[in-house]
A protein has these predicted regions:
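Short hydrophobic targeting helices and cationic amphipathic motifs
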Residues: 5-6, 13
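Hydrophobic alpha-helical transmembrane segments
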Residues: 14-197, 201, 209-340
Length: 340
């Protein structure tokens, strides 16, 4: 909701409070139902558009230079287009009725958060491990990770789960929340368009942001752009996580020591912060399509990664999310109260 949606007598602070209500509803919806299988999701629409555009670009752009140019257009066309369409949808719904606008805004914001999905994915694999069905655990894990899982041991499966939930805690939970909050304070924009634009950037990175062919050139802009726009929310999330973990000095010491070894400027920080807070070590040797790939070791190996450790990581993400949401709500309430 933006100033364009302002009804007579409404102030900017009141609009911010209304958007905060939508954010609270969205958080509850994600907690309650997550992303049900079979329901159309905005990321699916983004993925379809990105896939079609990428195939066309790869077909007609044959030189590295032309592919890089096409990649820039693909990246920012998708990001700005997603934000623009989201703005129009929210505007149209608000024009129909303010209640419709709030409802659609809440649903759209809920679709940007993946906290429930991450927890369900992790617990799905952990349930197979608990039932002592290693083959089932491997097959379920394969649905969520890119590495080869057919020969993984239980400790390796646990490490893969932890790395997945801690890496995706930023781009799937904290960064969308960050941009939703930022959007609330930008005139005319609003929470949904900015959060959706971020999801578009994240989806682009996951689909084309690879160093291997045929994506090395066409995906270069998407990968770099996602790195840049995730940098600030990642560091803020690490800061707040270090505080709620009760080990701020340990988390920052190990992040400064280890995080920069990772090729990604953000996932290394995210994974390392959790590893430091939990007293475990992530990284090591993985196989992708039969090819060995070694990732830097992050954190100190003080204890093994177990299902209990993974649950602690999921709870840290939830508490971090609730901390940001709570601070935003307190700010909105105090600002509205003090302005009267």
């Amino acid at each position: 909701m933006s100033r364009d949606f302002q009804s007579p007598g409404s102030s900017d602070l009141e609009l911010t409070l209304i958007m905060n209500y939508s954010l609270l509803i969205a958080a509850y919806l994600d907690y309650l139902i997550g992303d049900p299988w079979g329901w159309l999701h905005p990321v699916q629409v983004m993925g379809w558009a990105i896939d079609r555009a990428t195939k066309i670009a790869l077909k007609y752009c044959t030189s590295p230079h032309s592919r890089r140019l096409a990649g820039v257009l693909l990246c920012w066309g998708t990001i700005l287009g997603t934000g623009g369409v989201s703005w129009l949808v929210i505007y149209a719904c608000q024009w129909l009725h303010p209640s419709v606008g709030i409802a659609i805004q809440s649903i759209a914001l809920a679709s940007c958060f993946a906290a429930k999905s991450l927890r369900q994915a992790a617990e799905d694999v952990l349930a197979a491990i608990a039932s002592e069905d290693l083959d089932l655990a491997r097959s379920k894990l394969q649905m969520y990770v890119g590495r080869d899982t057919d020969k993984l041991t239980i400790p390796e499966i646990n490490r893969a789960i932890l790395e997945t939930v801690t890496e995706n805690a930023i781009d799937g939970v904290m960064a969308p929340l960050f941009y939703a909050i930022v959007g609330m304070f930008i005139p005319v924009v609003g929470a949904v368009p900015l959060a959706m634009a971020y999801k578009a950037a994240s989806t682009l990175d996951s689909m084309v942001g690879y160093r291997r062919e045929p994506y090395a050139d066409i995906g270069w802009c998407s990968a770099k752009s996602e790195d840049i726009i995730t940098w600030l929310p990642c560091r803020l999330a690490v800061l707040s996580l270090s505080l709620i973990s009760g080990k701020p000095l340990t988390v920052w010491r190990l992040c400064w020591r280890d995080a920069s070894q990772d090729l990604s400027p953000n996932s290394g920080w995210s994974e390392c912060s959790y590893a430091a807070a939990l007293g475990v070590q992530v990284g090591g040797i993985n196989y992708y399509q039969g090819q060995i790939q070694s990732k830097p070791l992050l954190g100190d190996d003080l204890q093994p990664i177990t299902s209990a450790i993974i649950q602690q990581a999921l709870n840290l993400t939830r508490n971090n999310f609730l901390l940001w949401l709570g601070l935003m709500t307190i700010y909105s309430l105090c600002s509205t109260f003090l302005s009267k």
